[in-house]
């Protein structure tokens, strides 16, 4: 049951007919994991905190550098040298002190227990981390909302293969290969800051729809491609790989 402070804080959300107080209660009862506290992780964590996701855990072992500041909007000049996850938690609490939110400074790997989370935000720029998140989310039947951004382009997808066997997983579409992977990180390829802000905001928007809305048809099973030069947003229907080593069995 929402208290008076909740009703005031989330007033502009709960008046939406398909959202209402029940939707807000579902958000407040949601445990979410954010992997990455950089260009995507910052807007994801800030908007998830503002929306009232009740418990948030953020993983990132990296420290803040001056070259991060064009896009990692929670981090400021006087935060340089601080751990990204720790700093992001403090900035989120300034927006919403009523949620529970903690940071983890260790590297995210396959030993991390994700069983208590309801959904996972993939905000990493490391290919191996994305495969690990995909495997864990499938195994433990979690919603995985994955974003990526480089230069002036972004991608977004919702993966629910563990919840519905008809959906593809990340590895169905991006299979592991022995070939050298293309450069997908901002450090080497470059990034325009607002692109990460847009994709991160879309990740939270999808999470809110998955958790809070009553009558909602999931966008899982699609890949969304954003082009910052043309403002095009393309939607590609994805097919399950029935030979996929992660989700085919």
Please tell me what each predicted stretch does.
Residues 1-249:
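Adenine nucleotide-associated cytosolic modules
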